[in-house]
Regions:
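Short, conserved beta-strand edge motifs with alternating hydrophobic and charged residues
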Residues: 26-28, 60-63, 103
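Conserved catalytic cores of phosphodiester-cleaving nucleases, focusing on short active-site segments
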Residues: 50-52, 57-68
């Protein structure tokens, strides 16, 4: 049985949603996709999955999924689930008048839910030195997106 890449599926769903909105957007190529053509050492880390402009406001979007039922992991072993360079890129966008959101999807088979969470909230989660965040807290601090 082939492994399903839920992250790529989520990105494709976001791509379809962006096509329905009257905005300019583009998909930022993943570093690992580029590294086939460029040496790994010089392939730059990408700031997010999508860049959009809506009503004149630049918007940075990064998609993350989790199959955990009770919480969203902030770390996988010792690696951050949301790398520092992505949080820093979100901060730069906001300092320059844009908006940045991390789209967190609870990947439960019959109850998929997506929340847009600001970079400030993500930073707060990491400053709390926790390994994960309860979905209830994400529900309170994020914006639930519907189809």
């Amino acid at each position: 049985m082939a492994k399903v890449d839920t992250g790529k599926n989520f990105e494709n769903e976001i791509r379809k949603s962006l096509k329905k909105i009257n905005c300019f957007w583009f998909r930022i190529q993943d570093t690992n996709d580029v590294s086939r053509f460029v040496k790994q050492a010089i392939a730059e880390k990408q700031p997010a999955d999508f860049m959009a402009v809506y009503k004149g406001v630049p918007i940075l979007l990064e998609c993350k999924t989790s199959k955990r039922e009770t919480s969203f992991p902030l770390y996988y072993s010792r690696t951050r689930a949301i790398p520092k360079h992505q949080v820093e890129a979100a901060q730069k966008i906001e300092k320059n008048g844009g908006k940045a959101f991390f789209l967190l999807r609870k990947d439960k088979p019959r109850a998929k839910r997506v929340f847009a969470v600001s970079y400030q909230t993500i930073q707060k989660f990491y400053r709390g030195k926790r390994k994960s965040v309860k979905w209830e807290q994400i529900e309170k601090e994020g914006i639930e997106l519907t189809a």
